[in-house]
Amino acid sequence: MKIFARLFFTLLFMGHAMAQETPQTQLPRIALSAGIHQMDIQVALTPEQHQIGLMYRSEMPQNEGMLFVFQAPSKQCFWMKNTILPLTAAFVADDGSIVNLEDMKPQTTDSHCSLKPVRYVLEMNQGWFAKKGLKAGSKLAGRPFNN
């Protein structure tokens, strides 16, 4: 019986460890836009989804990203632990306006923070916002923004 219990807990632990190193790809999706630029966005709503974010992904299509939705506006800080892709984080106000943009280097624990309290953070491939001419003050449209 002891052997069975040890085997069970070993397999349980291994399954949990493996699940943590798998990219989350089955999150709900929404469409966002910035002027003429369309985005296909996965939405991370829970603390667990926030924690995993875009970790462990080796690629992401050009117009895809992830929107992190928090319960209330507050200072948001992100890092890139276990994240392979270089990303840009847009810290976004409730009305969809970009507060600030932060380029984030893969596999680092440097903090990248909003300049003021925000409820939303949109991560896209690094350089996506710059290539589209988007900067602080630019507006995003679509659910959940109030526009």
Pin down the residues of each PLM region.
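Hydrophobic h-region of N-terminal signal peptides that target proteins for export
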Residues: T10-A19
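Compact, glycine-rich, soluble single-domain proteins
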Residues: Q20-N147
